[in-house]
Amino acid sequence: MIFLTLEHILTHISFSIVSIVITIYLMTLLVHETVGLYDSSEKGLIATFFCITGFLVIRWIYSGHFPLSDLYESLMFLSWSFSIIHMVPYFTNHKNLLSTITAPSAIFTQGFATSGLLTEMHRSTKLVPALQSQWLMMHVSMMILSYAALLCGSLLSIALLVITFRKNVENFGKSKSNPFLIGPFSFGEIKYVNEINNVLRNTFLISFRNFRRYQVIQQLDCWSCRVISLGFIFLTIGILSGAVWANEAWGSYWNWDPKETWAFITWTIFAIYLHTRTNKNLQGINSAIVASIGFLIIWICYFGVNLLGIGLHSYGSFTSN
């Protein structure tokens, strides 16, 4: 009973901290001179990491197995993975663009895990025979870590597309409304001095904003590639370890189970993404489009089988209890 109480306390503390972190992020968007608040939000997500770590350790102790046997535990582990990804740039003293992705992702996954939809899964149960293997920790942890990294990288790519599209729309609108920026100057009388000053000022502001957006786009592109590359490595390890485990449990390395099929599709999509990164003509928007497609594929792979409750991996589904 004490373990369940500790679980309950830790999950609610971590969820509350993440909620506060997101509130602080919103405040920093409104008020830029809040370095102290921003640093507090960074440390807040680190505190969330330790709370979820405590939850996983406690659940591991009293259940007797690694806490990745059902959807509830995997969602908590996914939230824990988002926290890890968040801490990497923080401790390497890089500008943490991931924080705008990891914090909302953590609160979304943890909020869904602790919601009433998964109440029956909150109490740990005995492992089904298929999961009673030392490969459980290796295979499932690698897959969840890959989902977290690939989701973060894909969201960064989606942000890149949004900023690029918005920039193009704004430039088109400004070119329509400001003839000084696209056509010959029509200066008549003595007002031409003021008109020239206005044109130069507008041109400078537009150039500065475009330069800042260019920098943000380049950073988003760089970080999305890094995070997706890491996630692709985890995904490859997870699929290979799962194949070995499947051979031990079911006598075959690959069965084209729905989960296996969508994992292969996910791997293929992000392999295409990494291939586009090797071609300079396909980098940027083209590779971001591929990553955006991958974002949808990951959710189908992660939740699709769980919603349907079919195939060899149905023990982690909503209908398994």
Swiss-Prot record:
GO terms for biological process: cytochrome complex assembly. The chain crosses the membrane at residues 9-29, 44-64, 71-91, 97-117, 143-163, 227-247, 261-275, 288-308. One of its GO terms (cellular component) is chloroplast thylakoid membrane. It comes from the Eukaryota. GO terms for molecular function: heme binding. It is a multi-pass membrane protein. It is found in: Plastid, Chloroplast thylakoid membrane. Keywords: Chloroplast, Cytochrome c-type biogenesis, Membrane, Plastid, Thylakoid, Transmembrane, Transmembrane helix. Pfam families: Cytochrom_C_asm. Belongs to the CcmF/CycK/Ccl1/NrfE/CcsA family. Required during biogenesis of c-type cytochromes (cytochrome c6 and cytochrome f) at the step of heme attachment. May interact with Ccs1. This is Cytochrome c biogenesis protein CcsA. It comes from Nandina domestica (Heavenly bamboo). The gene is ccsA.
